[in-house]
Amino acid sequence: MTKRTKKARIVGKYGTRYGASLRKQIKKMEVSQHNKYFCEFCGKYSVKRKVVGIWGCKDCGKVKAGGAYTMNTASAVTVRSTIRRLREQTES
């Protein structure tokens, strides 16, 4: 194991290689991909990444397709809000 500092955290494994700005970008991605996310089906924070783009809930067992590093991509959030807005317009 290499020696890690508190500041580097998850990207401490890269040491001084690849440059500071690239390590900052990688840190953002790796932190988000290892986070636990909220499950819409069972209501718990137990969704973790299985492989690239596939997210699974440990409690209820539901599997959902999402982004590579985050469960919801920016375009998916936009589409969801647009669908919700159109649905509200047709109901009223």
Swiss-Prot record:
Disulfide bonds: none
Cellular component, GO annotation: cytosol; cytosolic large ribosomal subunit
Pfam family, one: Ribosomal_L37ae
Highest rank taxon of the organism: Eukaryota
Keywords assigned by UniProt, alphabetized: Metal-binding, Ribonucleoprotein, Ribosomal protein, Zinc, Zinc-finger
InterPro entries per UniProt: Ribosomal_eL37/eL43 (IPR011331), Ribosomal_eL43 (IPR002674), Ribosomal_zn-bd (IPR011332)
GO MF, any single term: structural constituent of ribosome
GO biological process, one term: translation
Alphabetical list of Gene3D superfamilies matching this protein: 2.20.25.30
Chain positions of all zinc fingers (C4-type): 39-60
UniProt similarity note: Belongs to the eukaryotic ribosomal protein eL43 family.
Protein name stated in the entry: Large ribosomal subunit protein eL43z
Gene from which the chain derives: RPL37AB
